[in-house]
A protein has these predicted regions:
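Peripheral, non-catalytic segments flanking oxidoreductase cores
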Residues: 1-309
């Protein structure tokens, strides 16, 4: 079962031993946990879901005006079968997405955005998630024996990405009753926050290789470890396989993901706290940007080969 803990945004409460210990244990044991964050503006999340529904229910021609241009830019609309999170499977994902990388840099020109109101809302929610990200990453730095501000310069927003997602409702076809809507994968960066609207679908692979359904609990954020965090912690925090599978939902499934991915020039090598004589460093130093870009390009390579991007 996925652990759940209450996460205070205030510095004084967060730095107490118990929240730090539970955060560390949850990330070690599962690579996934669910947070209750009393100070989080859940009403704004409701507005984000409303904006997401309004965008995705527009005509395809209107959505295509804001089309995804390239994996390097990582911004814009993608339709069904335009991404393969598990490229080795040869299957495209049955989802739509509106991806917003580095929103801070795009806070000016409106041509990339459906409307000024949509832009303002997404920027506000992005900054809200950024605050939550800072509170968690500073705590992880303390756990790892690093300066509390270790991530401040490494997570300025260059690769930090907000993503709106829509998965289609089930049809009467039995072949689609348990269809995989987003292929099994691990996330690429440091941490991911996932917000769900109530329709289930996320499945996480446990240590025995069994897929476990994650309930869609209102006013909670699911946090999972990414590949770079696994490397930094020398496998102490696992980047766990997960996917989205059709659960017979009668309505479309909407979710919002926030990817806390480090700046491109950040070197990632196992932290000394997690390296011992019994457990030597398992990874060579890599650049964050090279890893993230390679993963993004792999998930879009079928499209590039077909000349669709």
């Amino acid at each position: 079962m996925m652990p759940e803990l209450q996460w205070p945004l205030s510095d004084s409460q967060r730095k107490e031993p118990r929240p730090l210990r539970r955060l560390d244990q949850g990330l070690r044991d599962h690579g996934f946990l669910r947070l209750e964050v009393p100070d989080f503006d859940w009403h704004r999340l409701h507005l984000v879901f409303t904006g997401s529904r309004q965008f995705f229910t527009q005509s395809m021609a209107e959505k295509r005006r804001f089309g995804y241009q390239s994996a390097s830019e990582n911004f814009g609309y993608q339709g069904v079968s335009e991404e393969a999170l598990n490229p080795a499977s040869g299957q495209f994902d049955a989802k739509e997405a509106f991806t917003m990388r580095n929103i801070r840099q795009r806070s000016g020109p409106l041509e990339s955005w459906p409307s000024a109101e949509f832009q303002r809302l997404m920027i506000a929610f992005y900054e809200q998630c950024f605050e939550l990200m800072a509170s968690i990453t500073s705590s992880i730095a303390v756990i790892a024996g690093l300066p509390e501000d270790y991530f401040q310069s490494r997570l300025s927003g260059e690769n930090v990405t907000l993503r709106l997602l829509r998965y289609p409702a089930a049809t009467s076809s039995s072949a689609e009753a348990d269809q995989v809507l987003a292929g099994e994968h691990t996330d690429y960066g440091l941490l991911t926050f996932l917000f769900q609207d109530g329709a289930p679908g996320l499945e996480v692979q446990d240590r025995e290789g069994v897929w476990q359904l994650v309930p869609a609990v209102a006013n909670r954020v699911v946090v999972n470890v990414g590949d770079l965090m696994q490397r930094w912690t020398n496998d102490a925090y696992p980047s766990t396989l997960h996917r989205v599978r059709q659960q017979g939902n009668a309505v479309d499934r909407y979710s919002v993901a926030f990817f806390a991915d480090p700046n491109s020039n950040v070197e990632v090598t196992p932290w000394p706290t997690f390296v011992t004589a019994e457990k030597p460093a398992r990874y060579q130093t890599i650049l964050s940007g090279e890893h993230i870009q390679a993963k993004l390009e792999a998930s879009h390579r079928p499209l590039l080969s077909a000349g669709l991007e």
